[in-house]
Amino acid sequence: MRQRDLKFTFVVGEGKLAFDVVEFELEEALCEPFRLNLKLASDKNAIDFKQVLDQPGTFTLWQDGRPARYVHGIVSHFTQGSSGFRRTRYELLLEPQLARLELCCNWRIFQEKSVPEILQALLKEHRVLDYEQRIYHEHLPREYCVQAGDSDHYLHDRLAFEEGLVYYFRFDEHRHTLVCSDRLYVQERIAGGPVLFSAQPEGDNPQPVLHSFRYSENVRTARQTQRDYSFKRPTYDQEHHLAGEALEHQGSSYERYDYPGRYKRSGAGRPFTESRLRGHRRDARVASVSGDDPRLIPGHAFALEGHPRADFNAWWRPVRVVHRGTQYAGQEEESADAPLGVSYDLRAELVPEDVEWRPAPLPRPRIDGPQIATVVGPAGEEIHCDEWGRVKVQFPWDREGRHDEFSTCWIRVAQNWAGADWGHMAIPRIGQEVIVDYLDGDCDQPIVTGRTYRATNRPPYALPDHKILSTIKSKEYKGSRANELRIDDTTAQISAALMSDHGASALHLGYLTHPRPEGGKPRGEGFELRTDEHGAVRAAKGLLLSTEEQLRAGAGHLDRGVVVQVLEAALELARELGDYAGEHQGVGHDAAPQQTLQEAVRDLGHGANDESGKSNGGKPAIALSGPAGIAAATPASLTLAAGEHVDSVARQNQQVTAGQKVVINAGSDIGLFAQGGELRQITHQGPMLLQAQKNDIRLEAKQSVEVSASQQHVLVTAKEHITLMCGGAYLTLKGGNIELGMPGNFVVKAAKHSHVGAASLEAELPQFEVGETQRRFVLKQLDGQTAMPNVPYTITMANGEVIEGVTDAEGATQLLQKDAMNIAKVDMKHTKSPASAVAGIAAAVGAAVAVGKLLGGPDAEAGRALSEGEISLAKGVFGDSIDYSTVRLRDEDYVPWQGKDYVMAPNGHIYFGEELRGVADWSLESLQRQGLFIHEMTHVWQHQHGVNVLLVGAYQQARQFLLGDQYAYRLEPGKTLKDYNIEQQGDIVRDYFLEKNEFGEASANSRFAGVLKNFPTGY
């Protein structure tokens, strides 16, 4: 339309440089920088480009002498053209400051900032100060957001569109303001009343109108579904799906499913999905118009009037507008054929005002391959990680990072194995170079996939000199020592070693050498387990130490045929000689203990995979076998102790030699029996003493008994009498008298006979004291130090006598008074009655403490409600069998004596001990801690199904105190959940949950289907 009341002007800077506008085209749209192309004229033919380029300028559309529209911006392009009679032509492009962001690109990281915060920082960096944010919804912080080489403008638009933000511009004479908002419906409406529609031909209307209106509807995506994955909640698919609006005129089954959804928190999933759907349906209902009302501005709604179709006379919002205008100079300045006058028209795309229009989402930049980075952390630290083993890194491209713990977010590290509380773990250490890849090529999802050596991190051994060595070598934390697993593949000299610098401890296997880097001097073949510190070898089911040959592991690892044969032969010899001695008045031989030990060695490997068809195994015995002999030597002392018997058998000779003393003590009998040879007891230098301190000594021989003293005398003394007998004759010395009796002759031969008065000679007889035989036993824990007080015990004496009691505060039994030493067996025992008593007391105390709570119920407002994630986690196990709205999580003790790491759930609420408090969402915790949550939710389930968890739990804890673990269970055929106590039920449900999440539902069902067949609807 040509209008004499229209005028276009343009000035640069502070109005010091003005141009005549010949033509202009302004293209502006929601979520796009505007572009104003101007064709200008000036009577100046040598304008300094410095005065124009990159300077602010203002275009004004005047109507009826008043400014109807301003467009303010920055000059991006300036061209000087041809000159006419008095004027020179120029061309110019005016854009917003936002367009300058397209000129800059960067590699950088934003951490823990929301998108509105990132956009604000980005614009401030470019000095876009006329900026207004209108935020009506929550925008969650992004833990990690990377600008991966894309332009600042692309980053701005990508983040804004992902978060459902739209932007447009508002103008005045001196500035243009960028307006950004997450709601479009509440934005500006144009001033000056409704926009008129007129179907009259262009140019026939006395006032600005829209003279063309075309309305269209397009079939577009009807539903948007998205999923994403978070390792913190691996069982939750984070699926969100939304249906579009105004689907009356199209099918509703057109679904777009996108993965990944590019969100890591469920709270961001819905708005992300909503924004994406709105972007796909941005032109589902659209109108195309043309006219000459300059008030149409993208983002500013207007009311339409005058259209013959009533429902089109509604509120509309322009999303794109193209303005064109011409303003030609007078004939005296141009050619005679130059057009005259002013014209202006526009074309626009509209959407209904109530449509929350969004642009199509922009793709994230893809990183096509892995990158190199360096692990970083706090100053003075060597290892810096979180509970997931994640680390922080410094990328070479990051100019803003400071090589510290703030350089990046926590980044996950790929490990060789990663199971539920099992797997491989090697945390990259500060200063190490790592390879960082990106999940789905997403720059915001880095993951460490490998490590590499470099100039500052050299391999453990110099290469290629020691290329035959393979090793896993660690470094002492804040130290210089190491642990190492080394494999040496040197030809004909292969070996392996597991080593620790602490105590120079190592297990060497194969061809043993000194370290290769130090020359590799041979030091043996086979294996060596050594340490400069202490060592121990333990085997709970038995241990075989043998030098019997077994080439290439050709038999079972407990092959003990030779040692069993030797033990059987020794047992047979001991039994034969012992029985013979017993039959000939020797001390009886008890072969049963030796036989028991021999059988234990015989059965040592029973139950193992190569002896599975036999018994379940013998006792945990140690068997030593050396075909060439066993030597034990020490320059100090050697002690051999046995709680029962020591049996020493030699098929030939047993020789005991001591440089000084040989001392043999026995609490009962000592028997020496030589079956076929001599028994000699000789003291070469000192005296020989043979005593029977409380009984008799008998010297008996089938032939002769000889008593002699080579140098001095033989003295025979007795307190009562001495009698010598032979062949019926006798001599008795008694009471100071001598009595001779004989059946035959009495012959006295002497050179002289002397008969004098009475005389006597007294000899001092030895005195024999009774030894101390009373004893008291002390019961101690396995550590040998901690006493066991108040433990019931039973002592069984060798004669069958039984003594019962309870240990005192020091763990001691009562004093046992016996006349002689006895063998005794001590047993600890549990009694049911104390457990029942304590259980009753515990239940009574628990009931007394909580009687008010039992009567009135727990405070329904205390603590916090379950989160959405916690409910979802619990529903995966309990379904809808729990009223989740009544469950409260309380960071407080239920009873004063609740332990710091204990959790109680006695009344439908869960009470956390001090060390377990402060968890915002248990569904985001580790799998094992989620298992704890499921265990406690089982008590909530029990409570809601009628179980008095408080009283039953008190009884159970009493049994736990006295009788041991009440949590351990064994799944048995035919038993369901009701056949187990409440703590076992909690552990069963927890283990079902863990197995389901670790190995899959099929595995969990195969193990727990029987016990949980009525669960969760009942027991």
Swiss-Prot record:
GO terms for biological process: protein secretion by the type VI secretion system. PROSITE patterns: ZINC_PROTEASE. Disulfide bonds: none annotated. The active site is at residue 936. Belongs to the VgrG protein family. Part of the H2 type VI secretion system (H2-T6SS) specialized secretion system, which delivers several virulence factors in both prokaryotic and eukaryotic cells during infection. Forms the spike at the tip of the elongating tube probably formed by haemolysin co-regulated protein 2b/Hcp2b. Allows the delivery of the Tle3 antibacterial toxin to target cells where it exerts its toxicity. Additionally, acts directly as an effector and promotes internalization by interacting with the host gamma-tubulin ring complex. Interacts with Tla3; this interaction promotes Tle3 loading onto VgrG2b. Interacts with host gamma-tubulin ring complex components GCP1 and GCP4. This is Type VI secretion system spike protein VgrG2b. It comes from Pseudomonas aeruginosa (strain ATCC 15692 / DSM 22644 / CIP 104116 / JCM 14847 / LMG 12228 / 1C / PRS 101 / PAO1).
